[in-house]
Amino acid sequence: MPHQPPNSPLGAFLEALGEAQIKCILIGSMAAIRQGAPLMTVDYGFWVRLPERQYVKILAIVQKQGGTILARTLYELRDGTQVNAIFQPDGLDSFEIEFRRSPAGELEGQPVRILPLKRVIASKRAAGRDKDLAALPVLERTLRLAQRLKAPPPRRRKKERRLK
């Protein structure tokens, strides 16, 4: 994930979503990468809280910022960064529930919620696409390692303490 300057097109895009009061959650492989998964992807996937029929609001933001519309929900920002707007991801609860579950983070100087790795796994499993299924072993291993690192050290038994 390349570092971009503070006024990067991605930061400007996220800022414009915020100004338009369009909430979003970073999902998919990029959310997993932000949590330590050793994956590669070419786009940022954002679950947007917007009825799909109102996708033109996002198109307007992209065009105003000099971006290109590649498909109805896939955009290329002026520096080539690809953004995918997702309206109904597979395998997840409602936007409100997932938004509350998702910790606040920062992306290119802008606040953003990041879907927890466990939920990324659930979504990829439910989507069932070959590329998602292929990523599951890596994602599950990353989750196990992250949980192991967060776990408190095992308590020593009284007998072990006496031996010292």
Segments and roles (model prediction):
Residues 1-164:
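Compositionally biased terminal segments of proteins
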